[in-house]
Amino acid sequence: MNIVSSAKRQIILDTETTGMNQGVGAIYLGHRIIEIGCVEVINRRLTGRHYHEYINPQQLIDTEAIEVHGITNEFIADKPKFAEISKGFIEFIDGAEVVAHNANFDVSFMDHEFSLLQPSGP
């Protein structure tokens, strides 16, 4: 009998943002990601591999958001922009199942950031 074992690779993801839209429309409108943190898990065990970046959102962080995560405008002023880190992030998560506690929030913001990288149509 040939038993094939396939390792299940998961990436646990968390983000921090400049805030969130409290009004009408999508939660990400008017806001950007300022931190991405990920850890790799294979077969439910941490591997020690991780991905972490602070990101310059090119806009100010809401005071309420600073109170939540403690990341200040001054701290992220010299950090890379999302476009500069996006390739490394994609390479890290490639082929894995991505898991997030508040997935709707994190995925909405990630989708928004990647949509901003797309060239505008004619």
Q: Where is each model-derived feature located?
A:
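Conserved non-catalytic scaffold segment of RNase H-like nuclease domains
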Residues: 1-122
